[in-house]
Amino acid sequence: MNLKKHSERKFDLITVGRACIDLNAVEYNRPMEETMTFSKYVGGSPANIAIGTAKLGLKVGFIGKISDDQHGRFIEKYMRDLAINTDGMVKDTEGRKVGLAFTEIKSPDECSILMYRENVADLYLTPEEISEDYIKEARVLLISGTALAQSPSREAVLKAVSLARKNDVVVAFELDYRPYTWKNSEETAVYYSLVAEQADVIIGTRDEFDMMENQVGGKNEATKAYLFQHQAKIVVIKHGVEGSFAYTKAGETFQAQAYKTKVLKTFGAGDSYASAFLYGLFSDESIETALKYGSAAASIVVSKHSSSDAMPTADEIKALIAQAE
């Protein structure tokens, strides 16, 4: 897939959706009830992907709504310090807060997240706050599935996708399913399908694609056949420790292994995977190599305490791949 076109545009990538606060337990191997110390990081899948791709050297912008308070200012400064453009970032004027995610790390196999997502600012991004002039400066627009969970954010995202299609901007859709933001599975399937049918690149886990198709135990062959009837050029389906698969509209299939690592926690892997996979495509690497980049980046992030701070450099990704091979 050619991401080299429109190289004159200001941004390689603009991500759309939530930016929130992650409070990760400093004390491992204990329940949250006994945890006294947490470290603060920027979180939220589209924010993490913006951070991950910026660390890999891409020119990145962000569209989303944040709180007009200390947490919102922390998020904005952190992203600006990484040279992420925040002209598309909107401050909520009605007192809404950013989401908070407290993480519990009992063991590498037993991690959980306690979410505070009631009345959060990011889900109140409105269609009027989506700028065509901003979006048409991007080569790729990345949509987060969670941003579709509620109005008016849902309509804002659909407008962004429409403007991207109008201005020859590649649409990437990271399914990013979070059950706590949706009313029911039928609603999820409707809006996921609506965006997936307009996306050029779709990335998700096998379980997330099952949510899109409103079924259990779905098969990759059926998923790709459905998506290739529409706009999709590349479909990436992740199967955890079994590795990941990429399918192209031209009929090619690629596979990458999951790289072994000392796992500290399980969250953050998907965001680092998407960041590195897209970086691989922008770098004109083969899809097979881009898959390796994604798998290696995920392996690095799950071995570290944070998600956003732990997003790897290209050298770190390539070193892990070389070591494994």
From Swiss-Prot:
<dbReference type="InterPro" id="IPR029056">
    <property type="entry name" value="Ribokinase-like"/>
</dbReference>
<comment type="similarity">
    <text>Belongs to the carbohydrate kinase PfkB family.</text>
</comment>
<dbReference type="InterPro" id="IPR002173">
    <property type="entry name" value="Carboh/pur_kinase_PfkB_CS"/>
</dbReference>
<keyword id="KW-0067">ATP-binding</keyword>
<protein>
    <recommendedName>
        <fullName>5-dehydro-2-deoxygluconokinase</fullName>
        <ecNumber>2.7.1.92</ecNumber>
    </recommendedName>
</protein>
<dbReference type="InterPro" id="IPR022841">
    <property type="entry name" value="DKG_kinase_firmi"/>
</dbReference>
<dbReference type="InterPro" id="IPR050306">
    <property type="entry name" value="PfkB_Carbo_kinase"/>
</dbReference>
<dbReference type="GO" id="GO:0047590">
    <property type="term" value="F:5-dehydro-2-deoxygluconokinase activity"/>
</dbReference>
<keyword id="KW-0808">Transferase</keyword>
<dbReference type="InterPro" id="IPR030830">
    <property type="entry name" value="Myo_inos_IolC"/>
</dbReference>
<comment type="function">
    <text>Catalyzes the phosphorylation of 5-dehydro-2-deoxy-D-gluconate (2-deoxy-5-keto-D-gluconate or DKG) to 6-phospho-5-dehydro-2-deoxy-D-gluconate (DKGP).</text>
</comment>
<keyword id="KW-0547">Nucleotide-binding</keyword>
<dbReference type="InterPro" id="IPR011611">
    <property type="entry name" value="PfkB_dom"/>
</dbReference>
<dbReference type="Pfam" id="PF00294">
    <property type="entry name" value="PfkB"/>
</dbReference>
<dbReference type="InterPro" id="IPR023314">
    <property type="entry name" value="Myo_inos_IolC-like_sf"/>
</dbReference>
<keyword id="KW-0418">Kinase</keyword>
<dbReference type="GO" id="GO:0019310">
    <property type="term" value="P:inositol catabolic process"/>
</dbReference>
<dbReference type="GO" id="GO:0005524">
    <property type="term" value="F:ATP binding"/>
</dbReference>
<comment type="pathway">
    <text>Polyol metabolism; myo-inositol degradation into acetyl-CoA; acetyl-CoA from myo-inositol: step 5/7.</text>
</comment>
